[in-house]
Swiss-Prot record:
Name under which the protein is recorded: Ribulose bisphosphate carboxylase large chain
Modification note: The disulfide bond which can form in the large chain dimeric partners within the hexadecamer appears to be associated with oxidative stress and protein turnover.
Subunit structure: Heterohexadecamer of 8 large chains and 8 small chains; disulfide-linked. The disulfide link is formed within the large subunit homodimers.
EC numbers, comma separated: 4.1.1.39
Length: 468
């Protein structure tokens, strides 16, 4: 009979559907699945589809009160990962009606919620998501985007330069503001609060905001260029975060900052909406990302977190460097950098992109390269990231032997020295060091910086590598 039959049945009988034709409105996910010994890959893939959509561990009679066929996730393809023992890529399609409009929070609660603790799997990693255009149109996305930011700043044809103020913790507000002034006066476009600078006993947020605003307006007046300092509005409550953003707007500064993973997607989306409505740019730091994305077989790849940020909203986001001290393999990094900036990105497994992604009219996000970079890296960074990026030197500015302002001068000279020959068709990858040495002849600040950092390398193999 067709009636309700209690008991446990295999997931694959309901949720593994290799004949399924995906729809344009489906959210598609690529999971790296490592099943427990004895669990067939089809059952593991179907279990992921079930537990992240309508399924549970046993048959329930209330299944009969809805149309499971309409709402269930479906594992529609499974591929073995070459060169890895017992690893598979399981492709899952989710009907769009499973998700609340305009909510990254709800999307992740479903797709990467309970399923990651599932016992039948040894490990599970979400490698990529295809977000359909119908769902993307329910998001505001970045407050302003790349072109609007360039127009606000009146800066074109080159990457933007930033610097994280160090030591990251312990400075008083006035000394902090002084460092901001010196860096901006020396030629940088932005300075930055470190991600863990919120409102601590040694420097309360309001004092920092006031001294940083004074510093950037003074530097602006003296250089004739528009300057910014990423004022970190991240706080313990959403209300406090909004209070800080409102105060920044009242000071007339151009940009605020948020730690979007520790702060949470709900808070981030609220802040992004406020920033668009009030003309503030929004810089996003990815603190905590490596907890989620560092392991190759478990967690979630950063390209998914990057896509989620573009939907939730941010004008800049940290994206690794390829050449500095933090993780970032070149092809993979450029894959998600394109996902942040471009309107349309083709599927390309050689860059880790599992699905073609159409962003329709959602503005782009500027990738920020930061972490252990200095003047010798400038040719490579200019070559790899191109104009639409922010190159952020913390120690690579403030560690200059002559002080902060000369450190900023060295970075600006190195950047201008790389952009000009690149525009003339010279090969920065091959001639980069020679170009920097040439520029040292007419910039003593750059020459001093080159001398200090000539031996520094971070030679470690990347953890995040492509499958064979």
């Amino acid at each position: 009979s067709v009636g309700f039959k209690a008991g446990v049945k295999e997931y694959k009988l309901t949720y593994y559907t290799p004949e399924y034709q995906t729809k344009d409105t489906d959210i598609l996910a690529a999971f790296r699945v490592t099943p427990q010994p004895g669990v067939p890959p089809e059952e593991a893939g179907a279990a992921v589809a079930a537990e992240s959509s309508t399924g549970t561990w046993t048959t329930v009679w209330t299944d009969g009160l809805t149309s499971l066929d309409r709402y269930k996730g479906r594992c529609y393809r499974i591929e073995r990962v070459v060169g890895e023992k017992d690893q598979y890529i399981a492709y899952v399609a989710y009907p769009l009606d499973l998700f609340e409009e305009g909510s990254v929070t709800n999307m992740f609660t479903s797709i990467v919620g309970n399923v990651f603790g599932f016992k039948a799997l040894r490990a599970l990693r979400l490698e990529d998501l295809r977000v359909p255009t119908a769902y993307i149109k329910t998001f505001q996305g970045p407050p302003h985007g790349i072109q609007v930011e360039r127009d606000k700043l009146n800066k074109y044809g080159r990457p933007l330069l930033g610097c994280t103020i160090k030591p990251k913790l312990g400075l008083s507000a006035k000394n902090y503001g002084r460092a901001v002034y010196e860096c901006l006066r020396g030629g940088l476009d932005f300075t930055k609060d470190d991600e863990n600078v919120n409102s601590q006993p040694f420097m309360r947020w309001r004092d920092r905001f006031l001294f940083c605003a004074e510093a950037l307006f003074k530097a602006q007046t003296e250089t004739g260029e528009i300057k910014g300092h990423y004022l970190n509005a991240t706080a313990g409550t959403c209300e406090e975060m909004m209070k800080r953003a409102i105060f920044a707007r009242e000071l007339g500064v151009p940009i605020v900052m948020h730690d979007y993973l520790t702060g949470g997607f709900t808070a981030n989306t609220s802040l992004a909406h406020y920033c668009r409505d009030n003309g503030l740019l929004l810089h996003i730091h990815r603190a905590m990302h490596a907890v989620i994305d560092r392991q190759k077989n478990h967690g979630m790849h950063f390209r998914v977190l990057a896509k989620a940020l573009r939907m939730s909203g941010g004008d800049h986001i940290h994206a690794g460097t390829v050449v500095g001290k933090l993780e970032g393999e070149r092809d993979i990094t450029l894959g998600f950098v394109d996902l942040l900036r471009d309107d349309f990105v083709e599927q390309d497994r050689s860059r880790g992109i599992y699905f073609t992604q159409d962003w329709v009219s959602l503005p782009g996000v500027l990738p920020v390269a930061s972490g252990g970079i200095h003047v010798w890296h400038m040719p490579a960074l200019t070559e790899i990231f191109g104009d639409d990026s922010v190159l952020q030197f913390g120690g690579g500015t403030l560690g200059h032997p002559w002080g902060n302002a000369p450190g900023a001068v060295a970075n600006r000279v190195a950047l201008e020295a790389c952009v000009k020959p690149r525009n003339e068709g010279r090969d920065l990858a091959r001639e980069g060091n020679e170009i920097i040495r040439e520029a040292c002849k007419w910039s003593p600040e750059l020459a001093a910086a080159c001398e200090v950092w000539k031996e520094i390398v971070f030679n470690f193999a990347a953890v995040d590598v492509l499958d064979k």
